[in-house]
């Protein structure tokens, strides 16, 4: 018999975290630890974040054994900004049983509908800024750092329940970070970029640990200006961005975090994240969480890190739309690729990229014969509101 109950106690939360051990048992690409710190982003987030987001977590049990989980999310800041009556679900994990899936999704939908929300979208973890969608590729692979990983049957769970895919986004893999310029047909583009760089007054600097708060505010402002017209946008708060940066700092290489400035004013930002999952996979066999973290960080920080971590995820390309220099995005990409080459990285993956986003339409990806390496999907379903 399947039962679904709301998470209430510390023991419930411990069982919530343990669901992944059951779901991913035998998955060769599964990493033993959650990609996000659930305590900091879900269970006990900072007050400033908790005040803008109401959640209800649910556990599914079969004969007393936990077999699935889900979180219903009412992002009040999103509702207030967009005026849209949409709730979200996320952190979905379940065994391959449609009765379990139905029970979990029914519970999340009922909670959102009771709050007057007319649709449910997801999965988000807990918002689009952190993690969004599920992998829908037929070929499983080691997840890219910060991106989703899930059993392929999740799509069937969602679709059978009535969720419909509403947005796809992709990652693009380049086995050589300078492939854009090394291909003969792009030699001319490289010459153009060099000429633009020579006459451009745009300068670059890396984010600094001692000024991370100030730089976080700069990145927040650039994000909110850049993505204001993007699908699913709502303004990002400083607290939320800063919390994410704090979680990422141990694995970031600040030489790959670029701020572009023009006349002393910030006009762009681009971040490359070393694919720490490659190091985490090396430590996955260890039983102790702290030992896994220690070994992973050792691989991340050692001088010969690229022996294990040869890849970089390119994320967070923000350019001030009011910047008079229209070459900033190209210059940022070129500068990052040169730094990756000099540091010894030989693989780069750009993700997430919306296929219909303004950035995609204007980016160098549209001028390349490049097909998506991975596909992620977000789903939606209208809800029936309870009668008065």
Predicted regions and their residues:
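Acyltransferase donor/substrate-recognition loop-hinge adjacent to the catalytic core
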Residues: 148-230
């Amino acid at each position: 018999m399947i039962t679904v109950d709301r998470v209430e106690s510390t023991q419930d939360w411990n069982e919530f975290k343990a669901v992944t051990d059951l779901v991913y048992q035998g998955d060769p690409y599964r990493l033993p630890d959650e990609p996000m710190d659930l305590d900091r982003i879900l269970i006990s987030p900072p007050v400033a974040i908790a005040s803008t987001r109401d959640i209800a977590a649910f556990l599914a049990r079969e004969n007393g054994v936990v077999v699935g989980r889900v979180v219903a999310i009412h992002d009040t800041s999103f509702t207030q900004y967009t005026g849209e009556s949409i709730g979200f679900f996320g952190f979905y994990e379940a065994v391959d049983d449609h009765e379990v899936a139905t029970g979990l999704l029914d519970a999340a939908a009922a909670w959102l509908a009771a709050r007057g929300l007319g649709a449910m979208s997801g999965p988000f973890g807990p918002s689009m800024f952190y993690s969004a969608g599920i992998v829908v590729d037929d070929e499983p692979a080691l997840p890219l750092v910060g991106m989703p990983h899930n059993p392929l049957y999740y799509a069937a769970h969602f679709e059978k329940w009535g969720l419909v895919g509403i947005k796809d986004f992709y990652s693009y893999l380049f086995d050589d970070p300078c492939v854009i310029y090394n291909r003969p047909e792009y030699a001319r583009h490289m010459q153009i970029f060099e000429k633009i760089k020579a006459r451009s007054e745009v300068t670059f600097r890396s984010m600094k640990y001692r000024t991370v708060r100030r730089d976080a505010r700069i990145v927040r402002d650039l994000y909110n200006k850049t993505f204001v017209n993007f699908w699913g946008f709502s303004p990002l708060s400083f607290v939320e961005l800063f919390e994410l940066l704090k979680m990422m700092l141990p694995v970031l290489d600040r030489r790959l975090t670029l701020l572009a400035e023009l006349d002393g004013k910030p006009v762009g930002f681009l971040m490359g994240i070393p694919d720490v999952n490659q190091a985490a996979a090396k430590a996955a066999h260890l039983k102790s969480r702290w030992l896994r973290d220690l070994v992973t960080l050792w691989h991340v920080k050692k001088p010969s890190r690229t022996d294990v971590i040869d890849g970089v995820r390119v994320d967070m390309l923000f350019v001030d739309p009011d910047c008079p220099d229209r070459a900033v995005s190209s210059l940022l990409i070129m500068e990052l690729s040169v730094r990756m080459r000099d540091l010894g990285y030989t693989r780069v993956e750009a993700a997430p990229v919306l296929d219909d986003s303004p950035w995609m339409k204007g980016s160098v990806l549209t001028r390349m014969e490049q097909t998506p390496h991975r596909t992620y999907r977000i789903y939606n379903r209208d809800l029936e509101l309870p009668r008065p």
